[in-house]
């Protein structure tokens, strides 16, 4: 039976910080050249404290992550930690790191899984994975920043290879079946590029509504590019609730300049049980 998604949009000024007891908010966020571009780290921390763990894309350097973690600790009086990929990936002209940040009292970092072995060079930036445990729920969290090009067919072609990414991380450990793939895919989930992934034998589903726009234009929200995918067979800890954080509150241009041109997206997971 298909899960019914409950989509909720968090407004930062009204939100209660943190997830309910026995639940966790697992998020993905394109941080727009974190560590390189001008950032309002205090406001960014006000946004991200709503989540328990966040997979970050577009990380320019370690210093940006450390500055963000420091600000989160000041803002919450809680300990935060991070993990950053050992090296950046991309092209000769532009490379970026992946990173994770999390609340130390709630999330346990188990180990890095490393980069997807992209033997056919199908991805401009190889996806990266790491293992975490929140309560009784352990999982592999894979993050990706897909190619963006004026030619949409290039983006579709890359997305068609996502099942290989899922299978790679799924097969690394026969005891760990919970694979969460989050990131900026630079395509709407309605695109044919996701047909292979969504027809996978493990019944992979998209957790973020196709109707929710996740990028920020100068005059409003624009595209549905950010998403989180799980297996409906294995990751029964997913409660069916997911959403995004309204980072702009109508201030689209300023948010693009000081925060990001994407919003964080997230899922809610039950942490009192583990079905592996």
Range-by-range predicted roles:
Residues 16-20:
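Boundary at the C-terminal end of the N-terminal hydrophobic targeting segment
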Residues 24-31, 47-70, 101, 141, ...:
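Active-site beta-strand/loop signature of hydrolases that rely on acidic residues for catalysis
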Residues 1-4, 184:
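Positively charged n-region of N-terminal signal peptides that target proteins for export
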């Amino acid at each position: 039976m298909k899960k019914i998604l409950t989509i909720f949009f968090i407004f930062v000024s009204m939100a209660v910080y943190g997830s309910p007891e026995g639940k966790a908010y697992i998020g993905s966020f394109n941080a727009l050249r974190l560590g390189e571009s001008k950032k309002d780290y205090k406001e960014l921390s006000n946004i991200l404290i709503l989540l328990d763990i966040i997979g970050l894309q577009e990380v320019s350097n370690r210093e940006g992550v450390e500055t963000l973690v420091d600000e989160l600790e000041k803002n919450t009086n809680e300990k935060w930690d991070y993990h950053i990929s050992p090296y950046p990936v991309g092209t000769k002209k532009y490379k970026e790191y992946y990173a994770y940040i999390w609340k130390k009292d709630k999330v346990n970092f188990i180990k890095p899984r490393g980069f997807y072995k992209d033997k056919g060079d199908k991805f401009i930036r190889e996806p990266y994975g790491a293992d975490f445990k929140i309560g009784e729920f352990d999982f592999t969290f894979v993050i990706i920043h897909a190619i963006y090009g004026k030619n949409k067919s290039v983006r579709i072609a890359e997305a068609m290879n996502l099942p290989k990414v899922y299978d790679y991380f799924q097969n690394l450990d026969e005891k760990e079946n919970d694979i969460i793939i989050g990131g900026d895919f630079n395509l709407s989930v309605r695109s044919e590029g996701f047909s292979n992934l969504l027809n996978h034998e493990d019944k992979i589903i998209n957790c973020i509504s196709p109707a929710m726009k996740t990028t920020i234009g100068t005059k409003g929200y624009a595209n549905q590019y950010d998403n989180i995918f799980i297996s409906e067979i294995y990751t029964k800890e997913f409660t069916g609730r997911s959403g995004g954080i309204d980072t702009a509150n109508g201030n689209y241009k300023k948010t693009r300049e000081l925060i990001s041109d994407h919003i964080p997206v997230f899922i809610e997971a039950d942490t009192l049980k583990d079905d592996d």
